[in-house]
């Protein structure tokens, strides 16, 4: 509630095109929080909302959570018809799909007051900011460090609000205390990027492949 109150203070006190970044650890409930923000915003502001994600799985998951909060929303994918867009106050989309729809002038965003960017540290979202020059941008992420060292997040956001830490979330029973186990796995396919960390692409390719997921399941069953 404290985070939501802070964010709504910015809605009231800051310019309508303000860019705010909100950080909360993984598992802290970012989707729940911004779904409640959308619900309250639509009631208060009477403007439309766009929620951006970077993966189709997150797109569908976000749409479901928004629906659970009573927010009538539409997923904008490559197959979706937008003839009924006037019936919706909230749209959920991935970057490339929305970019193509906007370039083709298929989606009316003239009444969009708020854009929420999930996993905002991914730089692919920046290409869409030009379409929402008059909208309030709310980025949410667990890691407020840009995926590209040459494109720092300070270039796109005016302020950072830091949420509760992992230890605070555990203490307040929002997160469970983790039991940690380690296994030796091959990491030779990981590529080090310009910022000294492994690239997002090589990490996703390694940790989401079937062999790695099978090892994860086996490790869980052994414990």
Which positions does each model-derived feature cover?
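N-terminal pre-P-loop "Q-motif" helix
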Residues: 1-16
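Conserved Walker B
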Residues: 112, 119-121, 203
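Post-DEXD/H (motif II) to motif III coupling segment of the RecA-like Helicase ATP-binding lobe
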Residues: 114, 121-180
């Amino acid at each position: 509630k404290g985070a939501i109150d802070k964010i709504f203070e910015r809605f009231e006190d800051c310019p309508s095109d303000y860019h705010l970044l909100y950080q909360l650890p993984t598992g802290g409930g970012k989707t729940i929080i911004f779904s409640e923000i959308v619900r309250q915003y639509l009631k208060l502001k009477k403007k439309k909302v766009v929620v951006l994600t970077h993966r189709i799985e997150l797109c569908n998951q976000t749409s479901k959570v928004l629906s659970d909060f009573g927010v009538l929303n539409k997923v904008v994918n490559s197959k979706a018809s937008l003839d009924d867009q006037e019936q919706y106050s909230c749209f959920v989309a991935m970057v490339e799909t929305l970019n193509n729809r906007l370039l083709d002038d298929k989606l009316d965003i003239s009444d969009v007051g708020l854009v929420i960017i999930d996993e905002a540290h991914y730089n692919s979202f920046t290409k869409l900011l030009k379409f929402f020059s008059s909208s309030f941008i709310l980025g949410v992420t667990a890691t407020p460090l840009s995926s590209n060292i040459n494109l720092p997040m300070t270039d796109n956001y005016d302020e950072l609000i830091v949420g509760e830490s992992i230890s605070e979330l555990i203490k307040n029973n929002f997160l469970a205390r983790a039991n940690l186990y380690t296994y030796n796995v091959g990491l030779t396919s990981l590529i080090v990027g310009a910022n000294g960390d492994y690239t997002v692409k090589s990490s996703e390719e390694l940790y989401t492949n079937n062999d790695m997921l099978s090892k994860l399941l086996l490790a869980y069953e052994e414990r």
